[in-house]
Amino acid sequence: MVKRIMIFIEGTTFYTKFPMFLFSKYGYKPIGRAIEIVNGWQKQGYEIYLCSYVRKRRYKYIKRIIDFYGMKYTEILCREKGEQYSEIVERIKPDILIEDDCKSIGGQKERCITNVREEFKERIHSIIVPEFKG
């Protein structure tokens, strides 16, 4: 069975430079060896789901950035209006969820895993990394 890894993009794999990240791919900078690591997992056969804080209407924008830097993925996930990150996690059902600690925006209450229902949460290996440290 193929394992699924879901990774939050901003703050976990990419550093964002305000306000450039709003309109330019150069506002996104890969953190450390994030691209190499993610591409290695993909090469090993993992399904890679990248989750962005941009809304669905800006999907093409974030896709261009990810493709520009050469990160491999199965799917890029963006929220619909009114959709919560926890709903995306529950829909994808990743084996592993990697996200940052959300320190600059309120910490634990802002993490994707926080509001995931227990029946899903117990099957997910949650990895929290320091924000912008990769």
Where are these regions (language model features)?
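Alpha-helical substrate-recognition element adjacent to the catalytic core
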Residues: M1-R79
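C-terminal cap/substrate-recognition subdomain and adjoining C-terminal extension
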Residues: R58-G134
